[in-house]
Amino acid sequence: MWELVGLLLLILAYFFWVKSKTPGAKLPRSLPSLPLVGSLPFLPRRGHMHVNFFKLQEKYGPIYSLRLGTTTTVIIGHYQLAREVLIKKGKEFSGRPQMVTQSLLSDQGKGVAFADAGSSWHLHRKLVFSTFSLFKDGQKLEKLICQEAKSLCDMMLAHDKESIDLSTPIFMSVTNIICAICFNISYEKNDPKLTAIKTFTEGIVDATGDRNLVDIFPWLTIFPNKGLEVIKGYAKVRNEVLTGIFEKCREKFDSQSISSLTDILIQAKMNSDNNNSCEGRDPDVFSDRHILATVGDIFGAGIETTTTVLKWILAFLVHNPEVKKKIQKEIDQYVGFSRTPTFNDRSHLLMLEATIREVLRIRPVAPMLIPHKANVDSSIGEFTVPKDTHVVVNLWALHHDENEWDQPDQFMPERFLDPTGSHLITPTQSYLPFGAGPRSCIGEALARQELFVFTALLLQRFDLDVSDDKQLPRLEGDPKVVFLIDPFKVKITVRQAWMDAQAEVST
């Protein structure tokens, strides 16, 4: 009896404590919450988290809160509120929560993806952007992308009229692009380095996708945790591989020939070491560990994401062969077979660009953006958001809002075209496939170029159809850190028009 009374008093004390933290403030409506465990007992046990959070909007509205352990998290499910968080008040919400698994992957908050807002994060992010600017000179980036896309096509020629899984070949080609950007290095497709990169990249994505209780209850790290050990293992492999490549790059470094992200970071370190006016700056901002964390983030953000979206594009085209034929008709008409499609062809290959945009809508790279953190006491809409509150934008909710999208669960590339089909449009602001603001995807421009050029080259040269076993790709997906797609095969057939054109050239 007395135990029950004590429990009730504890619960009441907890709720009064929560209310007393922000007296008089208008807070977002909250899920029920209990001491210590927070709202966990009241969250759906089954289904994908992004879908469950979307459904909770029916009861709690487009902004609501919940407690995970002792941490308050605000869920955003409407584009106006999302844009307020990401853009209008981007600096106020540019922080990153320091969770256990993310700290493991970021070497305690280094790099650009999981680092908290601050001068070190801002500087490293700025240097990554300068790397992409470096590759824009003389269309160097597009040449690199075309080279790897052609390499993929050459491999596929050997599998004419076969049904194969393109996951690994696509992964290897995309990885080589990232290796060139980060290290000015490319590998043969059977090189053990590429295999090692594939192992740790896929391993980290898979391991971090599972809900790990230590991110909610950090004190659980005192107990053995199989999930954490798996993440540590893959992070160790990643660090060893990248360190080995980095050391070789440092040996060959030439300040007169800056050609990669690593070169830019090494040069910045040298400049910082020689500059005595950088008072107040973290002395370790360009330590080897900081540099490797940033390079590791580019690998994590630039490989599995693009690879996965390319597979989603192929899957939806197999399901919708009429869309594939429309794209090929555009390619035949405006590009032909005498040259390689380029990113500049977007103004003519409208159905292709619309298809890419629709895939990014219906299966966003990350259904929920990486959590943000309020750096100061702030507000979202009419609601108060105290400092250190975690904020999660549910991109799935934005991209599947029936008030903004007609039949949001249907694959309809034409929604991104005007009624005449002659101009690309953005039908609503409820579309943020790469996020926005200070924490937007740092490789958005690269990803858009890769998706367009790879898909254009593939459809210029091949028909990609349902596999011989007539098993269509599953479209449900597996939402980890990246929205993965289940393995599937496509039947590859070299297009007769392409073969005829090559025969003419050879004669």
Swiss-Prot record:
Its main location: endoplasmic reticulum. It catalyses: a C21-steroid + reduced [NADPH--hemoprotein reductase] + O2 = a 17alpha-hydroxy-C21-steroid + oxidized [NADPH--hemoprotein reductase] + H2O + H(+); progesterone + reduced [NADPH--hemoprotein reductase] + O2 = 17alpha-hydroxyprogesterone + oxidized [NADPH--hemoprotein reductase] + H2O + H(+); pregnenolone + reduced [NADPH--hemoprotein reductase] + O2 = 17alpha-hydroxypregnenolone + oxidized [NADPH--hemoprotein reductase] + H2O + H(+); 17alpha-hydroxyprogesterone + reduced [NADPH--hemoprotein reductase] + O2 = androst-4-ene-3,17-dione + acetate + oxidized [NADPH--hemoprotein reductase] + H2O + 2 H(+). Pfam families: p450. One of its GO terms (biological process) is response to cytokine. It comes from the Eukaryota. Keywords: Endoplasmic reticulum, Heme, Iron, Lipid metabolism, Lyase, Membrane, Metal-binding, Microsome, Monooxygenase, Oxidoreductase, Steroidogenesis. Heme binds at C441. GO terms for cellular component: axon; cell projection; endoplasmic reticulum; endoplasmic reticulum membrane; neuronal cell body. Regulated predominantly by intracellular cAMP levels. The 17,20-lyase activity is stimulated by cytochrome b5, which acts as an allosteric effector increasing the Vmax of the lyase activity. GO terms for molecular function: heme binding; iron ion binding; lyase activity; steroid 17-alpha-monooxygenase activity. It is found in: Endoplasmic reticulum membrane; Microsome membrane. InterPro entries: Cyt_P450, Cyt_P450_CS, Cyt_P450_E_grp-I, Cyt_P450_sf. Pathway: Steroid hormone biosynthesis; Steroid biosynthesis; glucocorticoid biosynthesis. A cytochrome P450 monooxygenase involved in corticoid and androgen biosynthesis. Catalyzes 17-alpha hydroxylation of C21 steroids, which is common for both pathways. A second oxidative step, required only for androgen synthesis, involves an acyl-carbon cleavage. The 17-alpha hydroxy intermediates, as part of adrenal glucocorticoids biosynthesis pathway, are precursors of cortisol. Belongs to the cytochrome P450 family. This is Steroid 17-alpha-hydroxylase/17,20 lyase. It comes from Rattus norvegicus (Rat). The gene is Cyp17a1.
